Regions:
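Nucleic-acid-contacting surfaces of polymerase cores and analogous helical-repeat interfaces
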Residues: 1-172
Length: 172
């Protein structure tokens, strides 16, 4: 079994971790030259701001909707990614970075001790506790299916951020 952990709205969430006053506020992060939107908090997504949208199209909306805007801070994002990796590595036998905000976790053999779904929820809780970041986790027999299951965590909130494609969940 494999899990794919993906931090939710990673760049925007990193900005919020160190600014508690931004909780539940719309946040966007701009590209290197501040030319376009590269990250959005859920609140900013709800306002209709699109990924890749040019800054000049959002500038006026920033004032009207009280959107908090940040230039990208890659040192912060790298540091937070390393923190998440450290948490996952402390609880998992093998972790493989997939991108700055996604990691594959090798869960082979874990089902002999604990259900993969329960373990996924434990990982989510620990990452949230130690870093302040939330993540979705897809769990499946292959990495490709784990990636698909992770996508499903964003579509099906009733699974509380963990979708496990296991035999036990086949009819769920």
């Amino acid at each position: 079994m494999f899990a794919l952990a993906d931090i939710n709205s990673f760049y925007a969430s990193c900005e919020k971790v160190f600014r508690p006053n931004l909780r539940n506020e719309p946040v966007i992060v701009l590209s290197n030259n501040d030319g376009c939107v590269i990250a959005r908090s859920p609140e900013a997504k709800a306002l209709g701001i699109r990924m890749g949208q040019p800054w000049f199209q959002v500038r006026q909306m920033r004032l009207e909707k009280k959107i908090h805007v940040f230039s990208s801070n890659y040192a912060l994002y790298h540091s937070m990614s390393q923190r998440v990796m450290a948490v996952l590595e402390s609880l998992s036998p093998a972790v493989e970075p997939y991108s700055i905000d996604e990691m594959f976790i090798d869960l082979r053999g874990i089902n002999h001790c604990i259900s993969p779904e329960f373990f996924g929820h434990q990982l989510r809780e620990q990452v949230k506790s130690w870093t302040g970041l939330t993540m979705g986790e897809g769990i499946a027999p292959t990495k490709t299916l784990a990636k698909s299951a992770q996508w499903a965590t964003k579509q099906w909130p009733q699974f509380s951020g963990v979708v496990a494609l296991t035999a036990e969940n086949r009819n769920r």
